[in-house]
Amino acid sequence: MGPVMPPSKKPESPGISVSSGLSQCYRGSSFSKALQEDDDLDFSLPDIRLEEGAMEDEELTNLNWLHESKNLLKSFGDSVLRSVSPVQDLDDDTPPSPAHSDMPYDARQNPNCKPPYSFSCLIFMAIEDSPTKRLPVKDIYNWILEHFPYFANAPTGWKNSVRHNLSLNKCFKKVDKERSQSIGKGSLWCIDPEYRQNLIQALKKTPYHSHSNVFNTPPASPQAYQSTSGPPIWPGSTFFKRNGALLQDPDIDAASAMMLLNTPPEIQAGFPPGVIQNGARVLSRGLFPGVRPLPITPIGMTAAVRNGLTSCRMRTESEPSCGSPVVSGDPKEDHNYSSAKSSHARSTSPASDCVSSSSADDHYEFATKGGQEGSEGSFQSHESHSETEEDDRKCSPKEAKDALGDSGYASQHKKRQHFAKARKVPSDTLPLKKRRTEKPPESDDEEMKEAAGSLLHLAGIRSCLNNITNRTAKGQKEQKETTKN
């Protein structure tokens, strides 16, 4: 590297500064002499290299003189350039402002000097200096005037700035005043615990002050700060915060339910009693004696319970009518079709279904025989009766399905299924709270029960009558053949 001009050596003028800096690099050359004689000399580097061909390349790239010649920008005589210059003026003797100095600020020594704190920091110091950590606006004014005499003679606009910071800054929040306090008009202001660390960091960036030493360390425990700054904050209280916002009671229910889903069971045991149970906040009986929590029912449970009796009385088309007993709402109208046989008949084989249907059809056979005793006496013989029993045992589900279709039960069953779906859809679209409070119409359910029972009863009677007529026709035909033989 080439020679460097020492910092102690200062040029007398801008022109001399530039020429002397370049002369140190090119000693004894014609270029240094030309700098002193003619100021209009061309400073092109190709000409310099032609004149000094034997000079080393390192001296050509030496630009240390630019750092030493600090008066280059001042030679233009423009104050704006001096203000935006990146080069620091080491000879400037103007006293620095307190905000940019490392010296501590003292309001007693400089009462007319503006404090280097923002209004949010002033409000923060005023509130933290109070024993209750809460102050009205007028007490904040008095604290600032007491500790910073500058604002006594300052324009009155600083009070508006304090009020604007209180209302617009998220770090401060308004709290309700107690009845025992007599502060007059206005509200109490306190520090939001969530933004307290932000204010402490902002206060640390300002010069040291005797009032800021208490804010450098956070409180010993969050409970100690909450006991002085406001009511306790836990997941079930009305002041519970989520993402920096105060939640009201409806929001607390949803937020606490989501917290319960994301919280391990061992942590859930530490929640206060009555906060979260089954995904909903349970109200305390002592605080609200007339309020009782509603039980949590899954979606669609109310509609399922409402339509449970109707759906259980419906029979699908795949089930044979001869094997499934007719269900009636009244035990007296059961006609020997008990509901206990329904589960047993569906779990057994089709052969057992036919046996049960034959025994059931025998009851109707006896009733019809009593009416036809005078006209057809030949059906009382033991031979014809045994043959009809064997035919009943050979019945198949396909014949039963045909009998069911003849009775018109299939069309009625489809209509009833469509009606049940139409009733189920609006109830499922209702909100959960309305679904809890909504009661199913009992009159409609009773009508549907009676209609379903009567239709099933008529379908069973008609299918049985068809079987009886078929058996009687077969018996007559066989009897005629036997008489002819």
UniProtKB/Swiss-Prot annotation:
<dbReference type="InterPro" id="IPR047119">
    <property type="entry name" value="FOXN2/3-like"/>
</dbReference>
<dbReference type="InterPro" id="IPR018122">
    <property type="entry name" value="TF_fork_head_CS_1"/>
</dbReference>
<dbReference type="GO" id="GO:0000987">
    <property type="term" value="F:cis-regulatory region sequence-specific DNA binding"/>
</dbReference>
<dbReference type="GO" id="GO:0003700">
    <property type="term" value="F:DNA-binding transcription factor activity"/>
</dbReference>
<feature type="DNA-binding region" description="Fork-head">
    <location>
        <begin position="114"/>
        <end position="210"/>
    </location>
</feature>
<comment type="function">
    <text>Acts as a transcriptional repressor. May be involved in DNA damage-inducible cell cycle arrests (checkpoints).</text>
</comment>
<feature type="modified residue" description="Phosphoserine">
    <location>
        <position position="97"/>
    </location>
</feature>
<comment type="subunit">
    <text>Interacts through its C-terminus with the C-terminus of SNW1/SKIP.</text>
</comment>
<feature type="modified residue" description="Phosphoserine">
    <location>
        <position position="83"/>
    </location>
</feature>
<feature type="compositionally biased region" description="Low complexity">
    <location>
        <begin position="338"/>
        <end position="359"/>
    </location>
</feature>
<keyword id="KW-0805">Transcription regulation</keyword>
<dbReference type="GO" id="GO:0005634">
    <property type="term" value="C:nucleus"/>
</dbReference>
<feature type="compositionally biased region" description="Basic residues">
    <location>
        <begin position="412"/>
        <end position="424"/>
    </location>
</feature>
<keyword id="KW-0804">Transcription</keyword>
<feature type="compositionally biased region" description="Basic and acidic residues">
    <location>
        <begin position="382"/>
        <end position="404"/>
    </location>
</feature>
<dbReference type="Pfam" id="PF00250">
    <property type="entry name" value="Forkhead"/>
</dbReference>
<dbReference type="InterPro" id="IPR036390">
    <property type="entry name" value="WH_DNA-bd_sf"/>
</dbReference>
<feature type="region of interest" description="Disordered">
    <location>
        <begin position="86"/>
        <end position="108"/>
    </location>
</feature>
<protein>
    <recommendedName>
        <fullName>Forkhead box protein N3</fullName>
    </recommendedName>
</protein>
<feature type="modified residue" description="Phosphoserine">
    <location>
        <position position="85"/>
    </location>
</feature>
<keyword id="KW-0597">Phosphoprotein</keyword>
<keyword id="KW-0678">Repressor</keyword>
<keyword id="KW-0539">Nucleus</keyword>
<keyword id="KW-0238">DNA-binding</keyword>
<dbReference type="InterPro" id="IPR036388">
    <property type="entry name" value="WH-like_DNA-bd_sf"/>
</dbReference>
<keyword id="KW-0131">Cell cycle</keyword>
<feature type="region of interest" description="Disordered">
    <location>
        <begin position="1"/>
        <end position="21"/>
    </location>
</feature>
<dbReference type="GO" id="GO:0006355">
    <property type="term" value="P:regulation of DNA-templated transcription"/>
</dbReference>
<dbReference type="InterPro" id="IPR047404">
    <property type="entry name" value="FH_FOXN3"/>
</dbReference>
<feature type="region of interest" description="Disordered">
    <location>
        <begin position="315"/>
        <end position="454"/>
    </location>
</feature>
<dbReference type="InterPro" id="IPR001766">
    <property type="entry name" value="Fork_head_dom"/>
</dbReference>
<feature type="modified residue" description="Phosphoserine">
    <location>
        <position position="443"/>
    </location>
</feature>
<dbReference type="InterPro" id="IPR030456">
    <property type="entry name" value="TF_fork_head_CS_2"/>
</dbReference>
